[in-house]
């Protein structure tokens, strides 16, 4: 071993390199750039989640809401919708509602009508039209029965913007 390497091992600094920023002298856990990036992301994610929750409240979308995929099969109004295309919201994957993942489908609904294929009873709803003036549609879905209890389902630390963000950092 070279004298330089011996000196690094002796001082405990043995070429420590951050896996986040690739700089030497610290680890990912103590990386200042990562800490700053996480704080910036949390601030943006907090704003996004607040707008998302406001849209859910405005739509009356919550666990137990009845929804239908309007437009997915060419329906023009509620009279055209057959019962097998009506579902009830059963689950919201809160940690998947992320500023950097706007195109995901975190809201799960179960179809209510009889199905030919029992394996396909789930409907996954996309993100709300947060900045849209059209609050009658939710992605390509419409809320048929409005509920006002969504706030009781929100996890305690969800609005801080950090939950679920660890996968990005």
Language-model-detected regions and their locations in the chain:
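Intrinsically disordered, low-complexity linkers and tails
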Residues: 1-24, 29-169
């Amino acid at each position: 071993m070279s004298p330089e390497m011996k000196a690094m091992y002796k001082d405990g600094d043995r070429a420590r390199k951050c896996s986040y920023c690739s700089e030497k002298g610290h680890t990912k856990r103590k990386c200042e750039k990562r800490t700053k990036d996480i704080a910036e992301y949390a601030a943006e994610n907090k704003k996004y989640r607040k707008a998302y929750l406001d849209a859910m409240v405005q739509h009356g979308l919550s666990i137990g809401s009845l929804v239908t995929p309007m437009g997915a099969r060419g329906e023009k109004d509620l009279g055209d919708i057959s019962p097998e295309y009506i579902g009830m919201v059963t689950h919201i994957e809160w940690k998947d509602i992320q500023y950097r993942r706007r195109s995901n489908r975190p809201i799960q609904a179960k179809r209510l009508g009889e199905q030919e294929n029992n394996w396909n009873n789930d409907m996954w709803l996309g993100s709300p039209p947060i900045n849209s003036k059209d609050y009658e549609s939710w992605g390509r879905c419409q809320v048929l029965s409005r509920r006002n209890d969504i706030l009781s389902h929100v996890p305690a630390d969800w609005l801080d913007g950090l939950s679920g963000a660890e996968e990005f950092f």
